[in-house]
Amino acid sequence: MGSSFGKLFTISSFGESHGGGVGVIIDGCPPRLELDINEIQNDLNRRRPGQSKITTPRNESDEVEILSGLLGNKTLGTPIAMVVRNKDHRPKDYSEIKKTFRPSHADATYQKKYGIQASSGGGRASARETIGRVAAGSVAKQLLNKSAKTEILAWVKRIHDIEAEIHPSEVTFDEIEKNIVRCPNQSAADLMIQRVEAFGKEGDSCGGVIECVVRNPPIGIGMPVFDKLEADLAKALMSLPATKGFEVGSGFGGTYLKGSEHNDPFLPSDSNQLKTATNNSGGIQGGISNGEDIVLRVGFKPTATIRKSQKTIDEDGNAITLKATGRHDPCVLPRAVPMVEAMVALVLADHLLRQRGQCPD
């Protein structure tokens, strides 16, 4: 219940932050897809903790083990099971707060819903759960690239009040990965890093916005009316930990425009491809991809677990003062970049297979 996603290209994630490991089972991946296992590991490396001075110091190698579904590097069409073992979990870091409700964390709501919670490391509410998503998303990215030459890139657009000027059509992977904050605008990245470090030293945290572009998306994917492409993207991305907002194309900014300003005029073309003069729609019209770049943004709140003293209650409702210990990201955004890419890829791969099934021509 709640740990599976997709209709044809489906995933089920499992594991807790301080359990034996975390992983995913992919069902519905087409057979004979040749996978680059190094790409899966590289995406996990971009997500893993301890990779820079502005991420949690938890030291995990996050080496993926593929248990089933492949013959050599080719998919069999059977379930693909992948797992990453937890090696650096420290339950003792949570011994003093295991009966405490951290403000804005999932502790309280998990307890109220289930009557029990994984008090060590946040359990399923931990960002460590996303390891399975990133691994599965890497498979989905390879499927999309081989099927339609689709490229999915995400980057940090804003941290706190520092926003970068970025043109989605021009961003490259190397520009994104050249600094530890994963912002392709270097001058803005330098300021972002300083801001995250400053808040971390204060025992505080900050949030921001990740932007994502899909180039060469499959045309015509999306299922009206309840499975519109942007609706499924919103659900997928808002299922990531710490997300609080989603927009596609012009987003909320488009509400300030007139129709004559916002409409994307179609251009004459000799090919069967749709071309528009502008892209305020963000590559999606009527819930269906039109072939233009899909551009979207996701808002992430500040990390809930901080070292500053906060007023809260324990499981019995008693007022207490909490000063959290343990290892936590002062800002989740640099590590969330591959998570966003993964969830976008999973949605697109699922809709690609659904489109092939309904409209094979």
UniProtKB/Swiss-Prot annotation:
Keywords: Amino-acid biosynthesis, Aromatic amino acid biosynthesis, FAD, Flavoprotein, FMN, Lyase, NADP. FMN binds at R124, A125, S126, G286, K301, P302, T303, A304, T305, R327. InterPro entries: Chorismate_synth, Chorismate_synth_AroC_sf, Chorismate_synthase_CS. Its EC number is 4.2.3.5. Pathway: Metabolic intermediate biosynthesis; chorismate biosynthesis; chorismate from D-erythrose 4-phosphate and phosphoenolpyruvate: step 7/7. NADP(+) binds at R47. It catalyses: 5-O-(1-carboxyvinyl)-3-phosphoshikimate = chorismate + phosphate. Reduced FMN (FMNH(2)). GO terms for cellular component: cytosol. It holds the Pfam family Chorismate_synt. It comes from the Bacteria. GO terms for molecular function: chorismate synthase activity; FMN binding. GO terms for biological process: amino acid biosynthetic process; aromatic amino acid family biosynthetic process; chorismate biosynthetic process. The keyword Calcium does not apply. The keyword NADP applies. Its cofactor is FMNH2. SUPFAM superfamilies: Chorismate synthase, AroC. HAMAP family: Chorismate_synth. Belongs to the chorismate synthase family. Homotetramer. This reaction introduces a second double bond into the aromatic ring system. This is Chorismate synthase. It comes from Prochlorococcus marinus (strain NATL2A).
